[in-house]
UniProtKB/Swiss-Prot annotation:
GO terms under cellular component: lysosomal membrane; multivesicular body membrane
Protein name as catalogued: GTPase IMAP family member 5
Topology relative to the membrane: Single-pass type IV membrane protein
Species for this entry: Homo sapiens (Human)
Domain (AIG1-type G): residue spans on this chain: 25-228
InterPro entries the UniProt entry points to: G_AIG1, GIMA/IAN/Toc, P-loop_NTPase
Chief location bin: membrane
Amino acid sequence: MGGFQRGKYGTMAEGRSEDNLSATPPALRIILVGKTGCGKSATGNSILGQPVFESKLRAQSVTRTCQVKTGTWNGRKVLVVDTPSIFESQADTQELYKNIGDCYLLSAPGPHVLLLVIQLGRFTAQDTVAIRKVKEVFGTGAMRHVVILFTHKEDLGGQALDDYVANTDNCSLKDLVRECERRYCAFNNWGSVEEQRQQQAELLAVIERLGREREGSFHSNDLFLDAQLLQRTGAGACQEDYRQYQAKVEWQVEKHKQELRENESNWAYKALLRVKHLMLLHYEIFVFLLLCSILFFIIFLFIFHYI
């Protein structure tokens, strides 16, 4: 495997649109998502093979703003976006929307992979909230591009990751793995150089499988197109352009929230219909058995009477 090589630091103004006519393959765009303290920044460093993101063992987020760093893998540019606390259960603020807008700008025209970082053995209610926030920020369709990355791989000991996932008693984690179509891998972010190279290869194998399944497409929506347009404007963009863009960010997130609520309502309605159908089916079976019992009892009395 060709390892990652350190590339230049990216900025919001450096994003380029995809060019399918170019001989150079488009950059592989990865957004790191997950709850605060799960190891997103350290994972980004492991992917790029360099300590380009600030990473410390803290309960609170070290990353305050969205950041993008780049590298190459087998000649292909890799772009990794690290995110601050935008996937937490918190009130919607202008700072939150600004960070979401920056995330879109840095990853336009859209990510090939949303890398959901989860600490091995610590899948909690906060992780469940983070997953819902991912859907609110990027839309429910974003889950088609989610890859789960478990940190603290060293805690597996000699156990295979597949066995850990198959044998977990955490129903929420099982549902997540099923929703992500079993796309997952694990990292020891403090492993040796050789171990990290092997982890890079395992992750990229999962990403390549996802690419084949999605025919090379990436996740996008109207806001990513707006972000790409603002990128092209570059230095020519004025304050009014940014103000309008931020208003679109708020509108898009609210739209995603509404779609999520509607999907949940539809799911609940369909579940209720299934329950009613089962109750009706069981009721018919109960009536049939009751009539059979009565008929059997009458026959028994008739036979008993004439014996």
